[in-house]
């Protein structure tokens, strides 16, 4: 639906983006994750045509954004980091104004605005001046203006920043609902937000796209497999036996309520799966040590983010074995 191809952006001698390429398919919520200054806002400004790239190409529904700016921008709704609101206008009047700017057919504006007001939960404040609204409602109005003209793609720049916990939950629910009928790209520096809402994640670091994957791929891939097991055998006998397995890199004993049951965390070579589990079962059968629980764990988004943004950062997974 919308795609960046080898996009670079320079401000004089400063390179804000370097050779960034990615695609947001139709009907997906895509999260752009990165620290402050990573290049998230620059990326979104280029995606929406507010900034031209120094080099590279932006395609919207197969059309080049620079060559077909008018047609492409009709397909994009944009919520910048600071919503473009007019405090002296009422919510309803403002949305009518935005519809006129986007050249919505005049006979359809009234019904279109009321539909947006309902979708964004603004019915109770539609008659009020925007300047008198709370931060949460102002953000809802910002999302609402991005829906004017019924664009196929919504681009939201840190839509929950500065909101209180209840407002954050409400805006996230709204984004999830919009994702059912739109392609949504939104930026955030909150890991939990990306995990909760997105089908796909992109990690930017210092202007470079360091990581790109579906959330399902993230759950299923990784160099390391971790197994958490509860085994009916004393720790002193069990740990040396587990360490003898070729596929096991590290073993850590976890606290238990009884010495007859051992709780362990195993770090195994992911390339050995499913052989790792087979080796474990054979070993424990030979030791007459029943397995009470076996849970497979994968790399978290936090682990991937730390690895992508700082090669020298401590690995929280590795730390768990200390």
Residues covered by each model-derived region:
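Hydrophobic/anchoring residues in structured secondary elements
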Residues: 34, 250-253, 296
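Positions that flank functional sites
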Residues: 114, 132, 257-258, 299
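ABC transporter nucleotide-binding domains
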Residues: 2-4, 9-205, 209-211
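ABC transporter nucleotide-binding domain
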Residues: 172-267
